[in-house]
Amino acid sequence: MRLRVLVVIITFAFLAGCKEKPAATVKEVNALDEKSPDAPNPVEDPRFKEFFDHVRAYIKIHDAASTRVPNLKETADPQQVSGREKALADEIRIERAGAHQGDVFSPSAAREIGDIVAQDFNVRPVKDQHAILAEVPVKVPPAINTDYPTALPLATVPPGLLLKLPTLPMDLEYRFLGRHLILRDIKANLIVDFIPDAVPAAPSKSKIAGREAHP
């Protein structure tokens, strides 16, 4: 009995010392998210050449910053993990001190990607649109070189939509923050760039009710 109490105390102390991380969200996969052999290969799409050039330029900054941060040995200590994450983010901020929204998502890429996101959402059931937007209600717009909010969940991009977006290197990922599409540095938990209001506003529940009442 004393041993069990000790284990519970140690477990509680470990969890209390952990830095809160963005919680991953789980979505149901519907027919729109089933992988299709006809899915486009966006890596080869010439529309995104400028975007890929910007991504490669960012990865060079990320890699250079990473060499100035001590390597993390295999550890389960969350404080060491979060400490390196913060140190890496700080180094990247120094290198990108003058970064602005649109430096990676060029205007042409933002338009193309915005169209892809809008077309995908517009064919999804309204309840699914509301569910995605409700996951990360955000009142303050994102800012470049800031941390992805750890108090908010990491709203996942539907798999079917990911198949249509330009493929990213392993250190970057797409995330939603409200209606904004975020380009997130995974190892630094950093907002690299974003497309404002990439997700179209879902119809209000009152409008949906009105349509159902007057078909």
Task: Set out the residue ranges of the language-model regions.
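Bacterial N-terminal signal peptides
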Residues: 6-14
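Early exported N-terminus immediately downstream of N-terminal targeting peptides
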Residues: 45-109
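Bacterial signal peptide processing site
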Residues: 18-21
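Post-signal peptide N-terminal segment of mature Sec-exported envelope proteins
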Residues: 25-46, 50
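Positively charged n-region of N-terminal signal peptides that target proteins for export
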Residues: 1-5
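Mid-length scaffold segments of soluble, non-membrane domains
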Residues: 83-157
